[in-house]
Amino acid sequence: MTAAVTQDNTSRTGAAAGRVVRVIGPVVDVEFPRGAIPELFNALHADITLTSVAKTLTLEVAQHLGDNIVRTISMQPTDGLVRGATVTDTGKPISVPVGDVVKGHVFNALGDCLDTPGLGRDGEQWGIHRKPPSFDQLEGKTELLETGIKVIDLLTPYVKGGKIGLFGGAGVGKTVLIQEMITRIAREFSGTSVFAGVGERTREGTDLHLEMEEMGVLQDTALVFGQMDEPPGTRMRVALSALTMAEYFRDVQHQDVLLFIDNIFRFTQAGSEVSTLLGRMPSAVGYQPTLADEMGELQERITSTRGRSITSLQAIYVPADDYTDPAPATTFAHLDATTELSRPISQKGIYPAVDPLTSTSRILEASIVGDRHFAVANEVKRILQKYKELQDIIAILGMDELSEEDKVLVGRARRLEKFLGQNFIVAEKFTGQPGSVVPLEQTIDDFDRVCKGEFDHYPEQAFNSCGGLDDVEKAAKKIAGK
């Protein structure tokens, strides 16, 4: 086990002091005495006064330029920082509080508590740059994580202790789905949750904090935010800060941990900004040449070790709905399950707008989920795939040109498509409909019956946003009554 970082600020180089020689936005060059050059990733502190307010800037060493000069990235705005200002090497990386003290509180990327200033600074702290567990400590996981969301449990089952990606463009429901997952899992989950808000909207962070407080799950959750209005250095490091807190719960307290990250794309985006500021030549589509390395360093630490696990749910924005973009494409390789949110499905009013044909899970195998689950999931996909193939014919020639068999299949596929949607708990205040939680066995039974045609005579609209088939029958009677 790596030794914990304490509050001792004594530098290995004797708290060496340097001076600022250049400031360009968040990039600060600092000159140190010969033989006292700080190591890469060390945190440096600079005291400044702006409009009569004194504050301490944190800089992270990014490059050694030679001639005793280091190039750093500031974690806060550099307004008020001037050439010649004194900079002190702390002798350690950015460190965050760890342990039970972080539960129920909101922190920034530097480990400062935002709702209770000073909290955790006199206790144990860990540096945010850490090595992943060694190969012999890792443990493979194949246990299904039941969510109560039909489309996920049936077609893209999540792995306990695995990494799950929620992919989607702007406005298709990534944040709503991740909030729903927090609500559902945290209520039944006995361990600790850590939420990392990476470069997303401050408003969403506030909403999440209030909702978790209202649901009664905040006392077992640590929230770490580096939002849109913060410098790229902060947005790049906030995921590591949250992950460090999660690693403590896994490695020291031997807990199963839930780690939510919203949004991984903003982590990549911040890395791209920092790379440009450091003068690196951009790679494909303007991203940093170190994209795969940076993603790997983060993802390799999010893993399960013997006897304990980190289950990670990561929202991943897909720019311009282009899945070949290097940012989402680099993330795919690290995930156990991918849930792709589709704009055409969301435009039909089906939520969650999960694309059942492109979403995947490595545990959707008969040897893991069972023969019946596997067979029903494949039959649902077969019907939906056939419907997709017929859509061009329907659009050009109309339904009348289809064979009787295909007409039946299209009607069944439309019912299945609508039945894959359901009401969410977090959306109750907007829809006025209670959220539904459907057990996995019921989901398998219900979809098996729909696939066999038992409900072909029910109107399609009866399947909208329903939980189980009981809800469908009630909706059908209501429609018939009109």
Swiss-Prot record:
InterPro entries: AAA+_ATPase, ATP-synt_VA_C, ATP_synth_F1_bsu, ATPase_a/bsu_AS, ATPase_alpha/beta_chains, ATPase_F1/V1/A1_a/bsu_N, ATPase_F1/V1/A1_a/bsu_N_sf, ATPase_F1/V1/A1_a/bsu_nucl-bd. Its EC number is 7.1.2.2. It is a peripheral membrane protein. Its main location: membrane. It is found in: Cell membrane. Gene3D superfamilies: 2.40.10.170, Bovine Mitochondrial F1-atpase, Atp Synthase Beta Chain, Chain D, domain 3, P-loop containing nucleotide triphosphate hydrolases. The keyword Translocase applies. It catalyses: ATP + H2O + 4 H(+)(in) = ADP + phosphate + 5 H(+)(out). GO terms for cellular component: plasma membrane; proton-transporting ATP synthase complex. ATP binds at residues 168-175. Keywords: ATP synthesis, ATP-binding, Cell membrane, CF(1), Hydrogen ion transport, Ion transport, Membrane, Nucleotide-binding, Translocase, Transport. It is an enzyme of class 7 (translocase). Produces ATP from ADP in the presence of a proton gradient across the membrane. The catalytic sites are hosted primarily by the beta subunits. F-type ATPases have 2 components, CF(1) - the catalytic core - and CF(0) - the membrane proton channel. CF(1) has five subunits: alpha(3), beta(3), gamma(1), delta(1), epsilon(1). CF(0) has three main subunits: a(1), b(2) and c(9-12). The alpha and beta chains form an alternating ring which encloses part of the gamma chain. CF(1) is attached to CF(0) by a central stalk formed by the gamma and epsilon chains, while a peripheral stalk is formed by the delta and b chains. Belongs to the ATPase alpha/beta chains family. This is ATP synthase subunit beta. It comes from Nocardia farcinica (strain IFM 10152). The gene is atpD.
